[in-house]
Regions:
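Regulatory/sensor and coupling segments of signal-transduction and defense proteins
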Residues: 1-11, 62-66, 98, 125
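A short, aliphatic-rich beta-strand micro-motif
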Residues: 109-118
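Amphipathic alpha-helical "output/dimerization" segments
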Residues: 118, 136-158
Length: 168
């Protein structure tokens, strides 16, 4: 998996440096999360312009598209839900058994979330989960996941600076 992660990161860096499209970066980074880090599903969700709703835009992996369609959440300012906490703090998280509002949408396997940042603020998140009974998310896997999400953020900033045409 480490070799696969590195190969995808190289390809992703080349894409970002060439001003590639954000959607291409999402697919490459998601491939890294799925194949290189060992998650089963990935959802990339972006905040609506009013910043009160989080909407799934990309879903990859086994059941990822179904999960994406269900991934529509209204944010609560000051809420203690894992999603609200991530948006308010911009800190990646490993999710425990308590999934908050995600419980009715996502699976029960080990999961993590990390923010997609743009211009110093959270503009979305990446949710990734493993199948139930899969290995817990150790530090190495968690930091690799976060690194791929950071690459997505860089791709978004680069695409936006290129005139917005390449942004989501």
């Amino acid at each position: 998996p480490a070799e696969r992660q590195l190969a995808i990161l190289r390809e992703l860096t080349a894409l970002i440096m060439s001003g590639g499209r954000f959607s291409d970066a999402v697919y490459l980074a998601s491939e890294g999360i799925l194949q290189g880090v060992g998650f089963a599903r990935v959802v990339v969700a972006l905040l609506a312009p009013n910043r009160h709703q989080l909407v799934g835009k990309y879903g990859l992996g086994a059941g990822g598209e179904t999960l994406r369609k269900a991934f529509v959440l209204t944010l609560e300012s000051g809420g203690k839900d894992p999603v609200d906490t991530l948006v308010n703090t911009a800190q990646p998280q490993r999710l425990t058994a308590s999934r908050g509002r995600l419980a009715g949408i996502v699976g029960k396997g080990p999961a993590a979330m990390a923010p997609i940042m743009g211009n110093g603020r959270v503009i979305g998140l990446v949710y990734a989960e493993r199948d139930g009974g899969a290995a817990a998310i150790d530090d190495e896997a968690f930091f690799a996941f976060v690194h791929f999400v950071q690459q997505m953020s860089m791709a978004l900033v680069t695409a936006s600076r290129a005139g917005g045409a390449a942004a989501p």
